[in-house]
Design a protein with these regions (language model features):
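Short, surface-exposed secondary-structure boundary micro-motifs
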Residues: 62, 68-69, 113, 170, ...
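Surface-exposed patches in structured soluble domains
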Residues: 30-31, 46-50, 56-59, 140, ...
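Surface-exposed connector loops and short turns at secondary-structure junctions
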Residues: 128, 184-212, 234-261
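Sec-dependent bacterial lipoprotein signal peptides
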Residues: 1-17
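N-terminal beta-strand block that forms a small beta-sandwich/beta-barrel module immediately after a flexible targeting
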Residues: 15-50
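Exposed loop and linker-edge segments at protein-protein interfaces
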Residues: 50, 56, 68, 158, ...
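Amphipathic alpha-helical coiled-coil/rod segments that serve as protein-protein coupling scaffolds
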Residues: 24, 50, 56-153, 158-161
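Short, solvent-exposed secondary-structure boundary/capping segments
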Residues: 221-232
Length: 269
């Protein structure tokens, strides 16, 4: 009876050990995201927050808007200046044409025609200057808005309406799907099995089957196994960090999620 129990215990121990070991060319890792943080160029009071955590946004969508009282006043003033400049130009053009006709009748000196011509040119230049002022005012007004630079998922909103955001201080953090990658760790003895550009199979909870990726980076710096994938079998292993981008990014894959990475065989020539 004791012999039977001993054999059973030994068999169970061997089975547990075998199950805990990773198959050849299979490594452990996790998903990681490169977040995009959208900040205003100039500081100001946050007037509107148009998104919340978890929202899906398209490129160009409004994320937030700062108070624009001063910028709107500048634009209104610039538009009024353009209207006035155009009126002055019309009057200067009419006066110039009148002087030209009078000169043709020998009723005015050429100097008066030249003066009217110069006045018309100055008025034309003033219109261009006023139009440029409007362009600048609209540009400053647009800088008070934060818009999505790409399709993404909103990860965090750092400010509420009414709070003051400093220049270049992020208001919204977002994660474009293409910015998700998988970081994994390869034992020193298996380093020769992978290379940049190689294809891998990615397995994770809730992810679709046959999810593939491409190895984009392989570190040249060796380190001990990170705590995030620490186990009794790997605690003494020296590993190299590698990163793979996903050929297709499922919405079920999130930063920090454990991922098993397996090397895919190279296609036959």
């Amino acid at each position: 009876m004791r012999l039977h129990s001993l054999l059973f215990a030994c068999g169970a121990a061997l089975l547990l050990t075998a199950c805990d070991e990773s198959p050849k060319d299979t490594w452990h890792g996790y998903a990681e995201g490169n977040y995009v943080r959208v900040a205003p160029i100039g500081g100001g009071i946050v007037e509107k927050v148009a998104v919340k955590r978890g929202d899906l946004v398209k490129r160009g969508d409004l994320l937030f808007k700062l108070e624009t009282t001063s910028e709107e006043a500048d634009l209104e003033s610039a538009e009024a200046g353009l209207t006035e400049a155009k009126t002055t130009l019309r009057e200067a053009e009419l006066e110039y044409q009148r002087k030209v006709k009078l000169r043709a009748q020998h009723n005015v000196a050429q100097a008066e025609v030249d003066t009217a011509h110069a006045r018309r040119d100055r008025a034309g230049a003033a219109v261009l200057t006023a139009a440029s002022a409007i362009t600048q005012a609209k540009w400053r007004l647009a800088r008070r808005e934060g818009r999505a630079p790409a399709d993404a998922i909103i990860q965090d909103v750092m400010f509420r309406e009414g709070e003051f955001a400093n220049p270049n201080q992020p208001v919204v953090s977002m994660l474009p799907p293409q910015n998700i990658k998988v970081r994994f760790f390869v034992p020193e003895a298996e380093l020769g099995n992978i290379k940049e550009g190689g294809k891998v199979l990615l397995t994770c909870s809730g992810c679709p089957q046959n999810l593939s990726g491409t190895i984009r980076f392989l570190s040249t710096e060796v380190k001990f196994t990170p705590p995030v994938i620490y186990s009794d079998q790997s605690k003494e292993k020296l590993v190299y960090m590698a990163e793979a981008t996903l050929d297709e990014t499922p919405r079920t894959l999130h930063p920090g999620q454990p991922v098993t990475v397996s090397l895919l065989p190279r296609p036959a020539d």
